[in-house]
A protein has these predicted regions:
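Walker A/P-loop
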Residues: 14
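Hydrophobic anchor at the beta1->P-loop junction of P-loop NTPases
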Residues: 5
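Conserved substrate/cofactor phosphate-moiety recognition/catalytic segment
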Residues: 17-58
Length: 164
């Protein structure tokens, strides 16, 4: 099963993904920030976002093709990006109304040596602002999350995913 966890920056995508994989056996996890880092691709144009969705799809399809579950967490701001990824299941983290880079993410980015940008400046940049502007409400959502879930709620969600 290929699961997309999407939503605005700071909505809790990574937070949820890292908790879900603890309850799903044989499950890979790909985080967009790490995939971008290792690809050294920091293009947030429409084309760059589609390329990132296709890159995430490639990793996810590899895992799924080898009989594994996979969770990918990334903004996937447009229907086109979500369609390019072609998930089996969509979790929309609708916990905030405007994306932001949370302080823990800024701290994490500071420890990456090869970033071609200043993380603090990115959080105030046009590209980051554009993410809020271009984000389209997903038309296909299997689970719509509007709050940060408790451990029990996350376990229940993982059980629901396994039974799909």
């Amino acid at each position: 099963m290929k699961i997309l966890v999407c939503g605005l920056p700071g909505s809790g995508k990574t937070w949820l993904a890292e908790r879900l994989i603890k309850h799903i056996k044989n499950c890979a996890w790909y985080n967009a920030d790490f995939v971008r880092k290792f690809s050294n691709d920091w293009d947030f144009s429409v084309e760059g976002r589609i390329r990132q969705a296709n890159r995430m799809k490639t990793f996810a399809d590899f895992e799924k093709g080898n009989g594994r579950w996979v969770i990918c967490d990334f903004v996937a701001p447009t229907e086109k990006a979500r369609e390019a990824f072609a998930s089996d299941y969509v979790i929309w983290m609708d916990t905030i109304k405007e994306g932001r880079i949370v302080s823990s993410k800024l701290s994490e980015l500071k420890n990456i040596n090869n970033l071609p940008f200043d993380a603090n400046l990115l959080s105030q940049s046009k590209e980051f602002e554009d993410t809020n502007k271009v984000f389209e409400t997903p038309s296909k959502v299997d689970t719509h999350i509007t709050h940060f879930m408790s451990d029990d709620e996350i376990k229940k969600l993982s059980e629901e995913l396994i039974s799909v």
